[in-house]
Amino acid sequence: MLDFGALPPEINSGRMYAGPGSGPLLAAAAAWDALAAELYSAAASYGSTIEGLTVAPWMGPSSITMAAAVAPYVAWISVTAGQAEQAGAQAKIAAGVYETAFAATVPPPVIEANRALLMSLVATNIFGQNTPAIAATEAHYAEMWAQDAAAMYGYAGSSATASQLAPFSEPPQTTNPSATAAQSAVVAQAAGAAASSDITAQLSQLISLLPSTLQSLATTATATSASAGWDTVLQSITTILANLTGPYSIIGLGAIPGGWWLTFGQILGLAQNAPGVAALLGPKAAAGALSPLAPLRGGYIGDITPLGGGATGGIARAIYVGSLSVPQGWAEAAPVMRAVASVLPGTGAAPALAAEAPGALFGEMALSSLAGRALAGTAVRSGAGAARVAGGSVTEDVASTTTIIVIPAD
């Protein structure tokens, strides 16, 4: 503690009047009171919630454990609320102490007036006539000194008592900090144990079923049960393979990079398809009967150069085949029908067909159809022959002859 008695009243009074006053202390007291109210409300809410859960909807060992874990925290909230309320009350006491000390302190203007009077009396004390007044002024100044020192001593003691607060404690640890990591480890261990136990169980079942299945196969009378046993064995094998090669197994995860290689190969294959498509869609020279259209490969009809003069035509020069009007070239190209004997000298005339077999394979109606087919084939071949343009006139190809062989019936 400072020795306020050794300090003149100018310093003590100046310090008291230079500060912000009791306003910050009163604001701190109000803040502490608000915090205490919120903590009391939180403690009441916690308590009512836990009581409501453990009484009706949630009962049993878990609810008891949870209530026991939360109880220390609720108690800490209540204790902290009381401490906050006490801090607010002490802040109010400190503000009151300051007001008391401020009222007991001599105002600085009074001290300044005393000092000014003393200087004036000393300056005018030529013959000693101001000596009593100077003594009275000094006595008044000593009283102000003592008054400020007493006020400061009282304020220091009271403020020290008001500022002694109980230390706040940290909230208790109601949860296990390593619970999350432990839970993750337990879950992973349980998952691995479940997977390994599943595969082990399937293998054990397969090994136990294999002897009985082989024994049942040795007996023909139990074929049905043997097939049922094999079904069980195959099902066990399928389950084991599914666990080993599933989408989330090590083998399944190892196949993921292969998909990228497959996609990369398909992208490279796209570049190799371009030359084949270009060769397929590219222009080609016309051949055969389409060779006259070769100038069109450039895509422009104007590239065709006329071959000789223009084509000529005539009117009223057609001939008739029955009631059908056909070009003259058809009649000129039609072959002359000759007998088989004239074409093949070694072949004699065909014997007369028996009248009693009109429905035979080589009857009159069948033979007449052969002759009709010969005429039709000649007309079709003559009409379907490719025409050539030369010198402005159309010339027909020479029609090929058709030989008809008549086989006598037995």
Swiss-Prot record:
Disruption phenotype: Cell envelope-associated glycolipid phthiocerol dimycocerosate (PDIM)-positive mutants with simultaneous deletion of PPE31/PPE32/PPE33 genes have a growth defect in Mg(2+) restricted media, particularly at mildly acidic pH, but the PDIM-negative mutants grow normally.
Keywords: Cell wall, Secreted, Virulence
Domain of life: Bacteria
Database matches in Pfam families: PPE, PPE-SVP
Membrane-crossing segments per the record: none
Gene Ontology BP terms: intracellular magnesium ion homeostasis; magnesium ion transmembrane transport; response to host immune response; symbiont-mediated activation of host anti-inflammatory cytokine signaling
Gene Ontology terms: cellular component: cell surface
Signal sequence extent: none
Main location: secreted
InterPro entries tied to this protein: PPE_C, PPE_dom, PPE_sf
Location relative to the cell: Secreted, Cell wall; Cell surface
Protein family per UniProt: Belongs to the mycobacterial PPE family.
Assembly notes: Interacts with host Toll-like receptor 2 (TLR2).
Record PANTHER family: GLUTAMINE-RICH PROTEIN 2
Annotated function: Virulence factor that modulates the production of host cytokines. Interacts with host TLR2 receptor at the macrophage cell surface and induces the secretion of the anti-inflammatory cytokine interleukin-10 (IL-10) and the pro-inflammatory cytokines TNF-alpha and interleukin-6 (IL-6), via coactivation of MAPK and NF-kappa-B signaling pathways. Also increases the expression of IL-12p40 and IL-32 through activation of the ERK1/2 signaling pathway. Can induce cell apotopsis in macrophages via activation of caspases and increase reticulum endoplasmic stress response.
Annotated protein name in UniProt: PPE family protein PPE32
Encoding gene per record: PPE32
